[in-house]
Amino acid sequence: MTPIRTNWSRDEIAALFEQPFTELLFQAATVHRAYHPPEQVQLCTLLSIKTGGCPEDCGYCSQSVKADSGVEATKLMDVQRVLQSAAQAKDAGSQRFCMGAAWRNPKDRDMPAIVEIVKGVRDMGLETCMTLGMLTPKQADMLKDAGLDYYNHNVDTGPEYYERVISTRNYQDRLDTLQNVRDAGINVCSGGIVGMGETREDRVGFVHTLATLERHPESVPVNALVPVKGTVLGDMLADTPLAKIDDIEFVRTVAVARITMPLSMVRLSAGRESMSEATQALCFMAGANSIFTGDKLLTAANAGDDKDAALFDKLGLTALQGEEPLRRAKDEAGKAAIPAE
């Protein structure tokens, strides 16, 4: 079995990207099969519980106050409405319910409602994940006490390209929040977005950042940029060859993430609705084992449940069931991890 390493060098990761595609795919599939049931994919649902009005200037985001995207700011959703949505997601087959709020960071006054939401969703038997922006250690502890399973805070891209995408929050801010989450005992969900005009070397840096954390994220979402008119990147990349990342390069990124982070759930996230069935199949072969279901991801379109069901039937895939045994196995394997240098 491939050992779990956190001491990957950038040169090693670059060499993985440079491999012949079929060899890379074979290597990723081999690693995937060693740690995960290859025919099972986790189904997740994402709900925006507070949309728009974010003071950050993330160039990809339609919810930024800097974007002229037409997204209207809303208040935090009522607790019961969130729980109703969670119940609907469970009925549709989701095992994981993710909730996002367009904040730079949650205010202390928002935390009681957030805690109530987490407890309510957990009581339904769903795995819970939240993305609320930067967290203080105290807020992370509150979420842990409420029973939150995962906290998402993406690094977005490699450290060298980051400042071309965001100026209101630095790279270390993101890493600090991930550490606060880890210190609180919450599972880490962290990934990024490809196709923002970055180079392959930037994608190497993105994977390297995550693969050399003291402990790999338990969940790694890989997004393909959905260029939204009125956002900095949406307008900058419109009608250019960079407006959509090459499908093979996207699959390469998924494969390299799988090889370097064998235990992580690698999630196909935004951008999947524009991918062909063949591209999605290659991603699953390369080690992606989690998707978002439903018609919408925050403010972006997503492949609907019916399309996903048809694709799963065509590929012989099934929804992941009983993740707890997998988590125990991952904990055991994680004890043998090679430490970061």
Swiss-Prot record:
Entry's Gene Ontology BP terms: biotin biosynthetic process
Lineage top rank: taxon: Bacteria
Cofactor: [4Fe-4S] cluster; [2Fe-2S] cluster
UniProt cross-references to CDD domains, sorted A to Z: Radical_SAM
Positions contributing to [2Fe-2S] cluster binding: C98, C129, C189, R267
Entry-linked Gene3D superfamilies: Aldolase class I
Any one GO molecular function term: iron ion binding
Cofactor: how bound: Binds 1 [4Fe-4S] cluster. The cluster is coordinated with 3 cysteines and an exchangeable S-adenosyl-L-methionine. Binds 1 [2Fe-2S] cluster. The cluster is coordinated with 3 cysteines and 1 arginine.
Enzyme class: transferase
Keyword vocabulary terms for this entry: 2Fe-2S, 4Fe-4S, Biotin biosynthesis, Iron, Iron-sulfur, Metal-binding, S-adenosyl-L-methionine, Transferase
Occurrences of domain Radical SAM core (ranges): 39-263
Pfam families: BATS (PF06968), Radical_SAM (PF04055)
Reactions performed catalytically: (4R,5S)-dethiobiotin + (sulfur carrier)-SH + 2 reduced [2Fe-2S]-[ferredoxin] + 2 S-adenosyl-L-methionine = (sulfur carrier)-H + biotin + 2 5'-deoxyadenosine + 2 L-methionine + 2 oxidized [2Fe-2S]-[ferredoxin]
PROSITE patterns the UniProt entry points to: RADICAL_SAM (PS51918)
E.C. designation(s): 2.8.1.6
Functional description taken from the UniProt entry: Catalyzes the conversion of dethiobiotin (DTB) to biotin by the insertion of a sulfur atom into dethiobiotin via a radical-based mechanism.
Protein name: Biotin synthase
Organism from which the protein derives: Erythrobacter litoralis (strain HTCC2594)
